[in-house]
């Protein structure tokens, strides 16, 4: 008689947990980045919803003049926002346990810091989770690279800009009109419209929208007929089919004749790389622009660039923009200061209008 002994293959609880976390068979992939992403995004979302609805007014400027931001304190869906933490807090980390009471924490805008820090950690981990799932499936890593653009933009306005300005009270307000207020004040203080990196960001967003519309309409217009006139053309595609569902040669020929030959891609892979890269690079530059202006390396200043023979200024559009910027600057934070820095800097220093003559 032969006896066979075999050790039982029983994985311990930790190994089973690891297998479940990293399994690509789950309906939603979790991953190790997801272990951090899920609780942080949940915390940010729950706090945002509660604060947006019911947070009491916040002393944003640190001068004991609270600003109401929530729906229950008189705002509507357009004007409501989570108001940034107080200028009295500055760049200090302000968790709940650092305040003397919950009322003090709310008055100083503590929920804003809780939301943005958890949100930023969450989207960083979402980007890492994209890479992790791509790695597990044997895919190339360009999806998280593309997502790095909005991550960089969010990091710029929620973290880098407040660090450069010295206070989280200067961060992006979490609401609709609050976002517009941030944009307008940013223009007044940094002249962002005259910054080349912002211009590249505009080209990236508008160009990306244009290219997406062009690509979608070209493909839709050159579908290979698989259905009758009475059926939807969408039924002509079966998920996972090997053959192309549209005629790229026809699309290339059309667009090459509409513009010129070399404006049209004849390689599907390079085309789709271009469609991804254009808006991503543009938004990277926009985020870089915010991050440099955070430290007051501002947009171009062409004020008083044109003068006549008597030295009188001939206004250009740059001067019109400058006057608008100063007007906006004197209106915002109306009780925090009397004059903007541009007006409080003293008399203008004279500059030479002509080169001095050089004696031999």
UniProtKB/Swiss-Prot annotation:
Entry comment on modification after translation: C-terminally processed by CtpA; processing is essential to allow assembly of the oxygen-evolving complex and thus photosynthetic growth.
Keyword check for RNA-binding: no
Residues the entry annotates as binding chlorophyll a ChlzD1: 118
Main localization of the protein?
membrane
Co-factor note (free text): The D1/D2 heterodimer binds P680, chlorophylls that are the primary electron donor of PSII, and subsequent electron acceptors. It shares a non-heme iron and each subunit binds pheophytin, quinone, additional chlorophylls, carotenoids and lipids. D1 provides most of the ligands for the Mn4-Ca-O5 cluster of the oxygen-evolving complex (OEC). There is also a Cl(-1) ion associated with D1 and D2, which is required for oxygen evolution. The PSII complex binds additional chlorophylls, carotenoids and specific lipids.
Note one Pfam family from the annotation: Photo_RC
Q: State the name under which the record lists this protein.
A: Photosystem II protein D1 2
